[in-house]
A protein has these predicted regions:
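Short alpha-helical transmembrane interface motifs in multi-pass membrane proteins
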Residues: 7-8, 59, 93-95, 121-122, ...
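Alpha-helical membrane segments and immediately flanking helix-loop junctions
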Residues: 123-150, 154-157, 172-214
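Small-residue-rich segments of transmembrane alpha-helices in multi-pass membrane proteins
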Residues: 39-51, 71-76, 97-110, 128-138, ...
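Transmembrane alpha-helices that form the ion-translocation and gating core
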Residues: 97-135, 158-173
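Helix-loop-helix hairpins and the membrane-proximal interhelical loops
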Residues: 80-92, 115-116, 139-157, 228-229
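Helical membrane-embedded segments and adjacent short helical loop/helix-boundary regions
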Residues: 2-16, 20-82, 87-94, 98, ...
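Entry/N-cap segments of selected transmembrane alpha helices
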Residues: 11-16, 87-110, 152-161, 211-216
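Juxtamembrane boundary at the C-terminal end of a transmembrane helix
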Residues: 221-231
Length: 231
């Protein structure tokens, strides 16, 4: 089967799209947030590769066009931000302070976990960019000596958890301001959280999209500094 797929060119793209479509179908059929389309799609791809004995490296190479689309997809999130530009100008200081606090909290939590669990450095640095989009996080992890695949898995898991629990946490903490909710989701759960923020409202989506970009830049700059404090 692996040899047959190698002759099919971009079979990985088709497999990825089919798995995601199946994940969307399962999510709509069940109506449960737990059955997140991205989570279900990932499971379907893993099962497919395992059943047919296809190496992950072959799948990754074949699905490369999907990875290339990550960056323009992330950039496109600036569109709702442009539509809410006046809101950004009015709350500029508070917005950037909030994102900075989120980034420092994310890095600090990884440092604490690394010290408590005595994680290997290669694993710990792969966790540092867990709250930024994969387009940035995987490169940051590799630059610091981590594993891109592990970083990607942790980033996706972080996004799924943030998407599932973000709105509930806001309700429990009585956070009602749409700007605050959007910044929280974008800073902690990157693009996956932003998809949830867009469902919550225009302001939430715009602020979450901004948080992805700013948090990504801050993490890329601060992660090497944080890595110096790893055990």
């Amino acid at each position: 089967m692996a040899e047959f797929l190698q002759q099919c060119g971009s079979w990985g793209v088709l497999a990825t799209l089919a798995a995601y479509a199946a994940g969307v179908w399962v999510n709509r059929k069940t109506g449960k947030a737990l059955f997140n389309p991205l989570l279900m799609g990932s499971i379907f791809v893993i099962v497919f590769l395992s059943c047919f004995g296809v190496p992950y490296a072959d799948y990754k190479a074949s699905a490369q066009p999907v990875s290339w689309l990550l960056m323009p997809a992330t950039v496109s999130l600036a569109i709702p931000l442009y539509e809410k530009w006046e809101l950004l100008e009015k709350n500029l200081a508070a917005i950037f302070a909030s994102i900075a606090a989120g980034v420092l909290t994310s890095l600090g939590s990884v440092l604490a976990m690394a010290w408590v669990l005595r994680l290997e450095r290669a694993h710990a640095v792969s966790f540092l960019p867990k709250s930024v989009t994969t387009a940035i996080g995987m490169d940051v992890a590799e630059t610091l000596g981590g594993t891109a695949a592990l970083a990607g898995a942790v980033i996706i898991l972080t996004g799924i958890v943030g998407s599932l629990l973000g709105e509930t946490v806001c309700k429990v903490c009585r956070i009602t301001d749409p700007l605050a909710k959007g910044l929280a989701l974008g800073t902690s759960a990157h693009a996956i959280g932003t998809s949830k923020a867009l469902q919550m409202g225009e302001i939430e989506g715009a602020m979450s999209g901004l948080a992805i970009a700013v948090a990504g830049i801050m993490t890329a700059l601060l992660a090497p500094v944080a890595a110096n404090f790893l055990p």
